[in-house]
UniProtKB/Swiss-Prot annotation:
The keyword Ribonucleoprotein applies. One of its GO terms (molecular function) is large ribosomal subunit rRNA binding. It comes from Pseudomonas syringae pv. tomato (strain ATCC BAA-871 / DC3000). GO terms for cellular component: large ribosomal subunit. The gene is rplJ. The keyword Zinc-finger does not apply. This is Large ribosomal subunit protein uL10. SUPFAM superfamilies: Ribosomal protein L10-like.
Length: 166
């Protein structure tokens, strides 16, 4: 089905805006995935703050041409599903990775983060990034552990001096 020129321009503009706002992008081939499964994926994506769209490759290349995601141009072949993470860099990668576990025909092609190309086998790097809240809690536990150790050391020194004075 042919798309009118105005519609093509609108699609390119919409995807370009999503790309400029996105923190990372993940590209997949969803050929053979059922409509119901794709609807579920889109619902999960909305909840996770991820923009998901199936776009023609030529339009996608134009949309990401002036963004950090232009490194993905070589993987824009065949049916292309692209996802941009808007709130957390690893959100789209986590979403696609989880979805791929239940779908044999769903294939993650590649990802891009901060202008760097990540092959399909490197998606775990992006998917395992902690969220902001997780990173803060990890940092706080490290600080709390160091503080507790310092307090115990000072208490032991104090007890040692008291024992020596007595």
């Amino acid at each position: 089905m042919a798309i009118k020129l105005e519609d093509k321009k609108a699609i390119v503009a919409e995807v370009n805006e999503a790309a400029k706002a996105g923190l990372s992008a993940v590209v997949a081939d969803a050929r053979g995935v059922t409509v119901g499964a794709m609807t579920g994926l889109r619902k999960e994506a909305r909840e996770a703050g991820v923009y998901v769209r199936v776009v023609r490759n030529t339009l996608l290349k134009r949309a990401v041409a002036d963004t950090e995601f232009s490194v993905l141009n070589d993987v824009f072949t065949g049916p292309t599903l692209i996802a941009f993470s808007n709130e957390h860099p690893g959100a789209a990668a986590r979403l696609f990775k989880e979805f791929a576990k239940g779908q044999d025909k769903f294939e993650i092609k590649a990802a891009a983060f901060e202008g760097k190309f990540l092959a399909a086998n490197q998606i775990d790097v992006l998917a395992t990034l902690p969220t902001r809240n997780e990173a803060i809690s990890q940092l706080m536990s490290v600080i709390q552990g160091a503080t507790s150790k310092l307090a115990r050391t000072l208490a032991a020194v104090r007890d040692q001096k008291e024992a020596a004075a007595a």
